[in-house]
Amino acid sequence: MVETGKTICSGGTAPGKKPIVVSDWEGPWVSPDHAADIARTKLPRGGELWSALSNYALYLSDVKHVESFQPGGTLGLIAPFLITYDVGERDLNEMAIQDARFIVGALDAIDFLQRTGHSFWVVSTSYHQYVWYTAQIAGISQERTRCTYFPIESLQRDVKEHDKELVREITDQVADTAVRKLDKFKREEDLPPNVREAAETLNDLFLQRLRRSSFEHVLRTVRPVGGQRKLDSLHEILRLEDRSIKEAAVIGDSITDRNMLGETKNNKGLAIAFNGNAPAVENANVAVMSYDCTVTPLLIQIFGRAGIGEIEHVTMNWSPETLKREVSIGNLDEKLFARFLEPEVAKRARAIWVTGDNMKRVIDESVKHREEVRGGVAGKLT
C-alpha cells in the first residue's frame, strides 16, 4: 500500500520510469464517431442501420457468445453495406478530415505526456483511415496505433455483384430491427418473440447467407479491435516496451475498453474511464468527467510519482486544495496544476475513485457528461 502524502511507494512505476499510456481514441481524445458518421451519411437509412447492427453486435458478443465477435463488432457488420453502396477509400479519408475534432486540451495533453517521457499508444476500434490521420495530427506515429484495418477498395474487388444485390434487398429489413433493442437482454431465453424473430433474421444473414457469399472474405478480414482484441493489443504493447501492467495508465470510455480497463484495474495499474458509459466505469478505478483533457496527464503524473494508492487518496478527496498539496510534496508539477486551475477547466472537471457504493451515481454522472461532450450519436454509443 502507498502511504498517502509521500512520493515513495511500493507499487506504481520503477524509479526513473514514466507510466506507459495505452488509450482508446474516440471518446478520451476525439469527439466524433467516424464509422457511425460514415454509415449515417453514406448509406440508405444509415442511422437506423448503425443502431440495428450495434445492437446485434452486442447480442452476438454478450448474449449468443459467438467467439469471433467482440464488442465493437459493428465495424465488421457494417462493412458489407459500405461495400455494397460503393463507399470508397476517398469517402473514409474525407470523413476522417471532417471528423478530426479533438476534445478541448487533448493536443496539449498528449504533447505534454510525450514530451515528459511517456510512451503513448493508441488502441482503437475505429477504422485505420481515421486513427492514422488524427493520430498524426497529435504527433503519434502510425506504428504506435492498433486499430481496425479496413482495406475497403481491395475488398470491393472481391465481391460479386449478385451478392451486393442480396445486401440491397435486405437493407430495409435489417434497419427495421433497430427498434427491437437486441442489446437489452442478457440471455437468449429472455428474448420476447418479436426480438427473437429479429435476431433470427440477422443470424440467418450474417452467420449463414453472407458467410456463403463473396462477402465471407470481408467478414473474415475486417476484425474490429475491441474487447479481447484490445486487451491482446495491450499485452503486445507491454511486451514490446518490457513493462508491467501495474506501470500502465489505460484510458477508455466504452464497452470496447472493458477488458483492458478491467485487467489494468485488477493489477493495480491506473484504469481511467474518461466520460465513460456503464461498462467502462464498472471496469475502471477512476472515472473522469470533464470537458477538457488536462485532468488526464495530471492523474498520470501523480500515478507515476506516487502510485495507485495516492491516486485513490486524491480522487476520494478531489478538490483544488488536494491537488495543491500534491504540488507541495512533489507529486504534481506546478505548471500542470496551474493549467488545471484555469476557470473553465477546474470548474468542469472531476475525477472520482470508483467503488461499489458510488458506482450507480458515478455512472449516471459520467453518462451525462459523455452525451454532452461527444453529442448526438457518438454520445449514446455503447
Question: PLM ranges: what are they?
Answer:
Residues V2-D163, A287, Y291, A349, ...:
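Alpha-helical substrate-recognition element adjacent to the catalytic core
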Residues T4-K6, V104, D108, T116, ...:
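C-terminal cap/substrate-recognition subdomain and adjoining C-terminal extension
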